[in-house]
Structures are given as C-alpha cells and as structure tokens.
C-alpha cells in the first residue's frame, strides 16, 4: 500500500511539473509603414527624383531688309546660332554660354540642355562659332562673307521661349555691272574690294562693330567670271563693314 502511495505521489509530482505553462515565444512586430511609403521593409529609401528643368525654346524672325544691310533674307535649314543666357545683364552671361541652336526648317533645336531657372536676358548671334566665349566679342572675317546677325529677348520660367528679332550687323554693298559702250568681250574675270579692313568683332547685345586695325587692310574677293550683258545686268552683292 505504501508502495502505491509513493508511486502515486511521484506521478503527481511529474504531472505538476509537466503541466507548467509553456514558455511564450514573442511574436514578430510588423514594421510601421506610413502612407505613401513605397519601399519594402529592409530596403534603402530611394532618392527623390529632381523635377525636370524648364528648357529654353527659340523663335526667330528677321528685321526687314534694308538696302544697305546684309543678305540673309530668310532662315534656311542648317542655319545655326549661338545663344547666351544672362540673369543680370552683365558683361558676361551668368548662365548658359554659347549654346548651339540649329534650324531644321521649322524649329530651332538646342544642342544641349539650356535651363531657364529665373528671369533672364537671352543674347544670340548667327552664324554659330564654337570658339566664342563672350557675346560682346563675336569675331568675323570678311573673307568668309558671313552676314552676322544678332538679337536679344527676355524669358521667364513661365514664358521660357525667346522671341528673337535678328538684325543685320554688317553692310551690304550691291554693285551693278553693265557693258555700256565697252567694245570688248565684256568678261569680268574677278571682282575684288581692295584696301579695306577685313576683320573685327560684333557685340551681339548692341550690334556695335569694332574694326581690327592691328590686322591691317586687305582685299576681299566677292566674285568673278561674269559675262556682261546690258539686257541683263550682273548684280554683285558683297558683305562689308
């Protein structure tokens, strides 16, 4: 009987120990996700994307043709201008310098990003020269017979299109050749302006031309191989300072 009691007591003791509460395993706490968060738990947050900058657009028109001015009468595909942006109208552009804009027959296309970040002045010249660093000193050589155009406009972030009225900086010299009473064949093999200053710079802000006296005087060939006929006079145009 005692043996049974001992066995029963031992069994109860084991039962009491085995019926103790199980150890609680802590549940994982889900991460707090705020509204608008797109990153998965454990991932690094993405850098916010910068808003796309407003780009400068160009429209251009030509000043009415004058008898004594240059000879570009309309823009054609392939015409290319240089554009400067200045936010304080100082001697040097505070923003974009000498950006290229190429005309495709309909619109002017920028060769690079040209952001408009504040109210600004736009200064342009044509034809484009990648060596130009200052819009107040655009070089020219009469040997190239380029009609130098210049123009300015104002833009803002709300109105980022520069409406440029391009003006002629150079002078057009027009010569009419006639045979009249000349008894010879009437062949003009060469036409040259001699003893003239041939180079200088143009201020694209004002159109002022500065002659290069250090370069000296030279000759400018403007054509040749003309057969004179009074019924149809030969007209020769030359770009001069």
Question: Which residues does each PLM region occupy?
Answer:
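Sec-dependent bacterial lipoprotein signal peptides
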Residues: 1-17
């Amino acid at each position: 009987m005692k043996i049974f009691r001992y066995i029963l007591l031992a069994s109860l003791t084991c039962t009491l120990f085995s019926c103790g509460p199980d150890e609680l395993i802590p549940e994982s706490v889900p991460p707090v996700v705020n509204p608008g968060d797109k990153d998965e738990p454990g991932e690094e947050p993405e850098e916010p994307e910068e808003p796309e900058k407003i780009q400068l657009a160009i429209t251009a028109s030509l000043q009415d043709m004058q008898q004594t001015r240059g000879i570009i009468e309309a823009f054609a595909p392939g015409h290319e201008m240089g554009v400067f942006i200045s936010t304080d109208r100082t001697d040097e552009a505070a923003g974009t310098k000498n950006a290229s804009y190429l005309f495709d027959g309909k619109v002017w296309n920028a060769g690079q990003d040209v952001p408009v970040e504040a109210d600004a002045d736009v200064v342009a010249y044509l034809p484009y020269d990648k060596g130009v660093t200052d819009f107040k000193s655009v070089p020219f050589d009469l040997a190239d017979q380029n009609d130098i155009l210049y123009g300015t406009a104002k833009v803002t972030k709300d109105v980022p299109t520069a409406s440029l009225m391009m003006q002629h900086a150079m002078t057009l010299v027009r010569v009419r050749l006639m045979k009249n009473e000349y008894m010879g064949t009437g062949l003009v093999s060469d036409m040259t302006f001699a003893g003239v200053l041939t180079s200088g710079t143009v201020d694209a802000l004002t159109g002022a031309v500065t002659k290069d006296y250090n370069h000296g005087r030279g000759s400018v060939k403007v054509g040749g191989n003309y057969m004179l006929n009074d019924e149809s006079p030969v007209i020769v145009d030359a770009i001069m300072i």
